[in-house]
Amino acid sequence: MKRISLTLAIALAGCAPMAGGDDGHGKNVPAARADGAARNCVSVIALHDSEVRDYWTIDFHDHGKQWYRVTLPQRCNGLGNYRAFKYETSLSELCNTDIITVMEFGGPGGGPRGSCGMGMFQPVEIGK
């Protein structure tokens, strides 16, 4: 019984946040003010580019002046380092239920680095 308890305690310790550790929230993420109701999906045709801000945050910009901030429901490991991702959809929309795959480009061993669930698309005004 002691062996099982020790094994379980070690396994659970790996899931606990580290004291003083980096939680993946970037210190330089620009402030954003909500500008309307959050949306489940946005048209991929309307999206012009995206900016990965940290392990939790992606800002999408459409062809006009609209920005959408997606705060991922969980930290997406690798996203803050590689700052690149891909997605596949059979629809013409990217939705909060879709999965993104973190990508590493360049150098040997590049390629997919893990996948993460999306969040809601919050229309925002990005601060300077």
Where do the PLM segments sit?
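Helix-rich interaction surfaces within compact, conserved domain-sized segments
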Residues: 73-128
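N-terminal secretory signal peptides
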Residues: 17-74
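C-terminal motif of bacterial Sec signal peptides marking the signal peptidase cleavage site
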Residues: 11-14
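Sec-dependent signal peptide recognition
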Residues: 1-9
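Residues embedded in well-ordered secondary-structure elements
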Residues: 4, 47-49, 110
